[in-house]
């Protein structure tokens, strides 16, 4: 596709197969003009437009006035390719030219319409009137330079637009965008362009070369919003995806038209419109019965755009011959569809007169009105029918009453698989699995002729997963009924815990016992009398809800699947739930998806028609989109609306579901993307609060981690970066304020400040920084990172815990008396040198022996060794373990483990008390009594229990009493947290728990004291 759109018009696209063209056409008409394809009769023709419409259109900045065109053509007269550089006009002159009244045009009226509605090729234009000779000569001078004839003046509009906005032509990226610059390919979006199809003249290229002689933009006009190519430069990808605000937003009055004036028409919206947002234009089209799609196809009637941005949609529309339509053209189409007031009044009077004429001729049949399922009969005369006819009416009345009392979700529940909306492939897989279940798992053991062995990959159960309301349970029931199976449903309202071990309770026990009896007893389904009792299938609904109330339910369900003799269908919403982590290994996984809005809209239209509701198709599609594919919820809304109205329009759906829309779960990353997106500034305050409070813990952390990567769209072109830094400072200050508020919430339980914290931590930074995300370092991925604070906080707590362990071990060794801070700042470096330097410089055996002795001296374990090394690592500094050979490391580990059996342990948490199977969750501190009181009691206890004590031990204890006093005094007087001894004191004789009595009175503490005295305060394990 050439970059010059006019070349497309100059190509000989003869659709008549070489037939002779009609005579009487001028040179201007020789171009192949797009003709409007056959459209429904409801679409009004856009060929002609009155003078008021054209005058109103000229107020848009995308169309130049007549005076500007004459000045441009006179300036370019006879210049050929070497056009002089135009001077920039002042803003006041632009406004004056735009606001000048248009002169009356008589001769060139048809061409005015062509200029105004360039996107809509008129079908009624046959022979346009030739312009005056002077104007023709002016246009001819430029046309001769290009070798073309009959071109419009829209290229001058483009030149004026470039002259008014010269800054948009710059860019420093090597983006091979689809820009129209010299050397570029395609059509970019960096410049505002006129709406005409013939706006790609060579003049704008020459103007661009004259204004921007430097080729910093690379291949193509790779400006700030330059094409969609490889924008690898500093500014080439800056504003990609940005949708600018309409230039005349809210300045035009939205017209009113006939209710269904756009019925049967399909629109595609492209670019930025003149006064409407894209969402507003979509709502306007759907309100009058039109359809809006996202891509161009053969069924598209119009491409709605106020400027030809030259994207994929524009090129596709030109290839398929889809006419272009401006916003003003859409307004005219709607406005002309509304009849005049006099016509409406006359039509209403005629309608009333017809009713009056027909009313006496009608018989008075029985009128049946439905109000909440009740029938009200009005009128006394009954049409002359037989008794049979009246009886049929009575029967019909009774049936209507019975069916009217049902909810629509039950009334229109699918009866056959073809009635299920969407997921037909999943229905087919479930049908095939159920049909072949008996052959695979019941008869597979029979080695008869022609019997297939069971497939090793086959599953005895199936797991249906998907959002609620899309037909999972209905699918299970319908398919089971179709195959002649009796579906036994067990949902979340039933007790589904672990079955009783005493299975003899059988069906007389709990629901779990009944299920176990059902799946394990073959006589229930496979007895001799099979015809009287149908085969069964167990439907376990909402298995992801088997939580605390159903203890052991999932494990018992897995055991039931293994031994089951009937098919089991499990249904859940979230197949990735942790509760189902083990269940998915035993089930065939079938993932149900949400049906499309077109599928749901078609089904809802059928139901509305059966219920006598007049509903628009786009209204039903909007309802399907608002409920996120939940057809059950859509039917409930539709039934509720049918009680108060008989016609459901698009606006009715929007008005009802704006306040009662279905909630959906969104991740914190999705919430941050919406807050910081280009449309984040258009969100209402309640929407921002909902997004921020979707996860009040993670959303602020993700925002704090990523807000500096966003370039705000509100700062515009900021070469110096001062505006962006100002916004960053304000956002950082708001986050700091939120941290102060969050401390009050978390520490002092001031939860009434939650909204203030939400405002400061999420809403204010997002309002300041929403825009395009960009990378700040080479190699960085351009997506939101997870909050780094959580990982750093966890690492900090782990390091503090490990340092506390090493601190307690060093204190217990009695080689140093220091606090944790001194250990980290002063001693850790010295300890690291003593542990690593010998391994680097000395021979292996000597180094290993020295390091092990040093570790024994300070009661350091291997975990402490790793802690000291890990805490001594710093970014940008070498690893302390560098230079140590792997053989030396393995020798050190081996030597330390060899001496562990005889190693002296001085820390209380390393003491292994005999008889204690596992450590207690809450250890009790041993009570160390004064020496003067504990020794007599201890000796007394030893003498009273002499049958269990050796006399030699008692003698040694008496001898070591003077040496036993010093360690006990040190332990009692030292208040350090690290040397608090924690033991599980138990008595061996009478089974009493010594935690309930003083440590000095127990036998265990007495023996502990003896051992401590014998080893000089050291205990051997």
Swiss-Prot record:
Gly residues biased stretches: 219-236, 1011-1021
This protein's GO CC annotations: DNA replication factor C complex; nucleus
InterPro entries, sorted: AAA+_ATPase, ATPase_AAA_core, BRCT_dom, BRCT_dom_sf, DNA_pol3_clamp-load_cplx_C, DNA_replication_fac_RFC1_C, P-loop_NTPase, RFC1
Binding site residues for ATP: 465-472
PROSITE patterns the UniProt entry points to: BRCT
Residue ranges, compositional bias (Basic and acidic residues): 90-110, 241-255, 347-357, 965-977
The keyword Nucleotide-binding is annotated on this UniProt entry: yes
Basic residues bias (residue ranges): 123-138
Polar residues: bias regions: 374-392
Keyword vocabulary terms for this entry: ATP-binding, DNA replication, Nucleotide-binding, Nucleus
Annotated region (Disordered), positions in chain: 1-259, 339-392, 931-1021
Coarse class of the protein's main subcellular location: nucleus
Domain BRCT: 257-347
Induction behaviour: Down-regulated by sucrose starvation.
GO BP terms, alphabetized: DNA repair; DNA replication; resolution of meiotic recombination intermediates
Skewed-composition ranges (Low complexity): 999-1010
Pfam families to which the protein is assigned, alphabetical: AAA, AAA_lid_RFC1, BRCT, RFC1
Free-text tissue specificity from the UniProt record: Expressed in roots, leaves, shoot apical meristem (SAM), flag leaves and panicles.
Subcellular location: Nucleus
GO molecular function, one term: DNA clamp loader activity
Family as reported in the entry's similarity comment: Belongs to the activator 1 large subunit family.
The protein's role, per its UniProt record: May be involved in DNA replication and thus regulate cell proliferation.
Subunit structure: Heterotetramer of subunits RFC2, RFC3, RFC4 and RFC5 that can form a complex with RFC1.
Protein name: Replication factor C subunit 1
Organism: Oryza sativa subsp. japonica
